């Protein structure tokens, strides 16, 4: 079983296709990039070509690279906002498995929700939304979060952030209701 549907199989040796079939899919030398940024198929000749062309087509094939980009990008966004990231390597790894081209973004939520215990807010953001939490200079939970988009938005992420803030408001309102 595959986490995502299997669409193609690249099977090459010495720049030639090694024919095989699996799950009704024949091997070849074609793949595709990011479904929004570079959806057109292209051929590859070897692993270096595969890695390079996919990177050019906005797909980071190495999960460790995606984890590093998420962690460093989130930490930088937090620092730029005068905040600190709540470390959560497990969540970073999970999110790295959900995206091909990670783009960390900083969002915010209404301060009124800070009346709900921090553990409830962090759990709601983590479990339901896959958001990283942030702390202020005093070590208290900040009314902000980091989400990770799977694309570079033309508007710099404004619509993505607004949409995530909207959804989080509903989630936190539910948490607030059940807590009080």
Description of each model-found segment:
Residues 1-180:
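Amphipathic alpha-helical "coupling" segments that flank catalytic cores
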């Amino acid at each position: 079983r595959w986490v995502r549907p299997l669409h193609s199989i690249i099977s090459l040796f010495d720049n030639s296709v090694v024919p095989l079939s699996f799950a009704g899919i024949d091997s070849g030398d074609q793949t595709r990039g990011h479904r929004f940024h570079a959806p057109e198929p292209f051929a590859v000749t070897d692993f270096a070509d595969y890695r390079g062309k996919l990177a050019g087509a906005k797909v980071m094939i190495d999960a460790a690279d995606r984890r590093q980009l998420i962690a460093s990008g989130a930490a930088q966004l937090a620092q730029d906002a005068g905040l600190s990231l709540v470390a959560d390597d497990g969540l970073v790894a999970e999110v790295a498995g959900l995206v091909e081209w990670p783009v960390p973004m900083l969002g915010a939520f209404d301060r009124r929700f800070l009346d709900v215990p921090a553990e409830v807010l962090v759990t709601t953001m983590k479990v339901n939304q896959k958001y990283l939490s942030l702390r202020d200079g005093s070590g208290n939970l900040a009314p902000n979060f980091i989400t990770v988009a799977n694309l570079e938005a033309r508007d710099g992420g404004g619509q993505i952030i607004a949409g995530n803030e909207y959804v989080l408001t509903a989630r936190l309102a539910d948490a607030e209701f059940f807590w009080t």
